């Protein structure tokens, strides 16, 4: 069988770059395979994806050597239009992919360009939407859909093209746990029904491995450094060395000194249950529970907060919440549960229907957005949506300039904040020269100028690889030690487990759980009601038959935090 994607000694260098982004790339993907291409940020995996779908060389210019064949043809000798018939791409940013005003218009876009007759077009669009179970949404605007639904509509559009290769660019990056599971199941269904070749660019290893991949290709510093089945990749212990995360239950087994020389540790069901149980019991007996510090002073108190949009049912109903100084709280729940609405109510964008918000006992419910914004800051998921100035120094000093601080005061304050955030060496850099992670820290630096007491972070680690994820969350932990409180809106259960002090779960506008993270995420009923994903760590404990999984999670998290100095 001939490969459908073939790279041999392929090197690519952007026109403006001093060094090649891809060097001596060689691999083959065969028809019908499901393949993951993974690597940390900046590894070259996105450039490789662009070489597959034709964006290189037709949208991004550069110089290449070596051989590349997609469906038997060299894409450099054709056109991006021809390439799009062979390779269908689903972008990480779904909104950037939509053309039509309604779902059916968007799915019909390719067919319209092919001048397909209208009657036939309607049938193809209807069939494509039925294949992905989105036919009842055909008249809706794409922008009214959830992240998972948008991705599904994009896939329906690709099915109209009959492309043999489906390329997914970080398909799980912006999805809640339920939508991520749905997306993976949808990929499986499409593969089983149509035998498409599926190529995925992703660094969320644990989730995407559920797709039953045929092959994993690891990229680092522009080179292929490993290739094999998921089992072979996990057995090699290479993932942590290149800044990617192993499944958290495998991390746990290694921390427990589980001897896996004669065991296959992936998937979990292959483990010897009795051996796992004994190792966990022995480890637990040696552990000492950390003495819990008394809670800090109360910072913010929310009482009976309700909110509804005009002519709609309540989005928040009788929400009661306490936040303490220096505390990191995870705000969890599926898309539409009310997390963003609650955040917008705290910062004053939403005018609450009833209820009260108090800061250290003072009622701030009637405060203006500007006044409230000086003590409660909101950091968006995408840093590019917040940054307005051309350089790092100008961005951080912007608010101080508006408040008429003197040049000397601005210089001293900004430089101090940049040092705290690890950005002082880059103070004169242009914004476009910063990495994504540096931009995330820059948005934090900008809000620190007002000395906020509480910072709300919306999906702070979305789109970041594990190395930058750990770096950013350690930075947040250090700020919390200085007394700043954080509310972290996240779909990442591992982040909640490892870095937050408490978890609050919203469901249909109501708080259904508010407790320590290991109590909340160890509660199966809460997870099911809120459509949250159970951590593989709790699955491991259930698999082992150990009683009191919450107890193990408490001991394990205490241990990891001691090791990391958190």
From Swiss-Prot:
The keyword Nucleotide-binding applies. Transmembrane segments: none annotated. Residues 5-246, 300-533 form the ABC transporter domain. ATP 1 binds at residues 39-46. It holds the Pfam family ABC_tran. InterPro entries: AAA+_ATPase (IPR003593), ABC_Co_transporter (IPR022216), ABC_transporter-like_ATP-bd (IPR003439), ABC_transporter-like_CS (IPR017871), ABC_transpr_CbiO/EcfA_su (IPR015856), ECF_ABC_transporter_ATP-bd (IPR050095), P-loop_NTPase (IPR027417). SMART domains: AAA. GO terms for molecular function: ATP binding; ATP hydrolysis activity; ATPase-coupled transmembrane transporter activity. Its EC number is 7.-.-.-. It is found in: Cell membrane. It is a peripheral membrane protein. ATP 2 binds at residues 333-340. Keywords: ATP-binding, Cell membrane, Membrane, Nucleotide-binding, Repeat, Translocase, Transport. It comes from the Bacteria. One of its GO terms (cellular component) is ATP-binding cassette (ABC) transporter complex. Probably part of an ABC transporter complex. Responsible for energy coupling to the transport system. Belongs to the ABC transporter superfamily. NCBIfam families: PRK13648.1 (NF010167). This is Putative ABC transporter ATP-binding protein BC_2655. It comes from Bacillus cereus (strain ATCC 14579 / DSM 31 / CCUG 7414 / JCM 2152 / NBRC 15305 / NCIMB 9373 / NCTC 2599 / NRRL B-3711).
């Amino acid at each position: 069988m001939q490969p459908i994607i073939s790279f041999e000694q392929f090197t690519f260098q952007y026109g403006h770059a001093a060094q090649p982004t891809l060097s001596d790339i060689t691999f083959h993907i065969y028809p019908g395979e499901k393949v993951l291409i993974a690597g940390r940020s900046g590894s070259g995996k996105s450039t490789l994806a662009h070489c597959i779908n034709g964006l290189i060389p037709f949208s991004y210019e550069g110089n290449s050597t070596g051989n590349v064949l997609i469906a038997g043809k060299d894409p450099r000798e054709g056109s991006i239009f021809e390439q799009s018939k062979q390779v269908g791409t689903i972008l990480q940013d779904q909104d950037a992919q939509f053309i039509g005003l309604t779902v059916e218009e968007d799915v019909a876009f390719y067919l319209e360009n092919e001048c397909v007759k209208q009657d036939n077009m309607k049938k193809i669009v209807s069939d494509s939407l039925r294949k992905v179970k989105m036919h009842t949404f055909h008249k809706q605007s794409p922008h009214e859909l959830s992240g998972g639904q948008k991705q599904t509509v994009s896939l329906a559009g690709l099915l109209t093209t009959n492309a043999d290769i489906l390329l997914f660019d970080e398909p799980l990056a912006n999805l809640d746990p339920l939508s991520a599971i749905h997306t993976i199941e949808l990929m499986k269904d499409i593969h089983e029904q149509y035998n498409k070749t599926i190529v995925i660019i992703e660094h969320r290893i644990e989730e995407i491995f559920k797709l039953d991949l045929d092959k994993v290709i690891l990229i680092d510093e522009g080179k292929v450094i490993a290739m094999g089945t998921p089992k072979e990749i996990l057995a090699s212990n290479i993932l942590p060395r290149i800044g990617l995360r192993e499944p958290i239950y495998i991390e746990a087994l290694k921390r427990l000194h589980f001897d896996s020389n004669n065991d296959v540790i992936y998937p979990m069901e292959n483990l010897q249950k009795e051996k796992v149980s004994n190792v966990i019991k022995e480890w637990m007996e040696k552990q000492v529970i950390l003495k819990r510090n008394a809670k800090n002073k109360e910072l913010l108190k929310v009482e009976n907060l309700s909110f509804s949009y005009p002519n709609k049912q309540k989005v928040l109903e009788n929400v009661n919440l306490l936040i303490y100084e220096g505390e990191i709280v995870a705000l969890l729940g599926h898309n539409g549960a009310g997390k963003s609405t609650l955040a917008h109510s705290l910062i004053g964008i939403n005018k609450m229907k009833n209820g009260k918000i108090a800061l250290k006992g003072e009622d701030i419910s009637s405060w203006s957005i500007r006044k409230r914004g000086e003590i409660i800051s909101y950091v968006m998921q995408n840093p590019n949506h917040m940054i307005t100035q051309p350089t790092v120094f100008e961005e951080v000093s912007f608010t101080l300039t508006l408040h008429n601080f003197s040049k000397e005061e601005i210089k001293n304050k900004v430089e101090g904040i940049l040092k705290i955030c690890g950005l002082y060496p880059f103070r004169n850099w242009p914004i476009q020269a910063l990495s994504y992670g540096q931009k995330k820290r820059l948005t934090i630096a900008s809000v620190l100028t007002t000395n906020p007491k509480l910072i709300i972070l919306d999906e702070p680690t979305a789109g970041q690889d594990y190395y930058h994820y750990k770096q950013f969350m350690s930075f947040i932990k250090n700020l919390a030690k200085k007394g700043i409180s954080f509310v972290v809106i996240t779909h990442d259960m591992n982040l909640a487990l490892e870095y937050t002090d408490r978890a609050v779960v919203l469901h249909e506008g109501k708080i259904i759980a508010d407790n320590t993270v290991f109590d909340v995420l160890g509660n199966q009923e809460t997870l099911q009601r809120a459509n949250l994903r159970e951590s593989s760590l709790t699955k491991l404990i259930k698999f082992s038959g150990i009683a009191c999984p919450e107890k193990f999670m408490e001991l394990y998290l205490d241990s990891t935090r001691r090791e990391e100095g958190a």
